[in-house]
């Protein structure tokens, strides 16, 4: 049995195949996922698992260099936005690097998901609970 934190074989495999600057999306239950992008559906029911639960597990395994977030989260989901920023700050300290945070419109965000290696769908049902993670290197 795998000893690492990620037990889901699809997520573990996807993270292990990421190269520098490749992207991976963690999203809420409502984000449209392009047919051309690999979909890893973790949603069981509304809120399970939460966006932050999925993000926490993914970022424990993935080296993150940058993050892209929809600008609209600031107004429409400020509590999650603050939680997300705190998580990224803690991740920076743990990884020993600076994580660049970029904001874009939700429409542009949806277009960028088509370029990602995969989209991991959580059961989150709050607005704009989505992030594009850009892979870094550990050396």
UniProtKB/Swiss-Prot annotation:
Q: GO CC terms on record? A: cytosol
Q: What organism does the record attribute this protein to?
A: Escherichia coli O139:H28 (strain E24377A / ETEC)
GO BP terms: namely:
D-ribose catabolic process
Listed under catalytic activity are: beta-D-ribopyranose = beta-D-ribofuranose
Name of the molecule in the record: D-ribose pyranase
Query: Can you say where in the cell this protein is located?
Result: Cytoplasm
GO molecular-function term, one example from the UniProt record = intramolecular lyase activity
- List positions binding substrate: 28, 106, 128-130
- Keyword Cytoplasm included in the entry's annotation: yes
Keyword terms: Carbohydrate metabolism, Cytoplasm, Isomerase
């Amino acid at each position: 049995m795998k000893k690492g934190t990620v037990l889901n074989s699809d997520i573990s495999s996807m993270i292990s195949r990421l190269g520098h600057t490749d992207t991976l999306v963690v999203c809420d239950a409502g984000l449209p996922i392009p047919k051309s992008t690999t979909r890893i559906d973790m949603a069981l029911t509304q809120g399970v698992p939460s966006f932050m639960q999925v993000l926490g597990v993914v970022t424990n395994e993935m080296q993150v260099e940058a993050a892209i977030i929809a600008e609209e989260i600031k107004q429409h989901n400020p509590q999650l936005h603050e939680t997300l920023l705190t998580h990224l700050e803690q991740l920076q300290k743990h990884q020993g690097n600076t994580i660049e945070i970029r904001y874009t419109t939700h429409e542009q965000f949806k277009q960028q998901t088509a370029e990602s290696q995969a989209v991991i769908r959580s059961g989150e049902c709050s607005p704009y609970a989505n992030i594009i993670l850009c892979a870094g290197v550990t050396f």
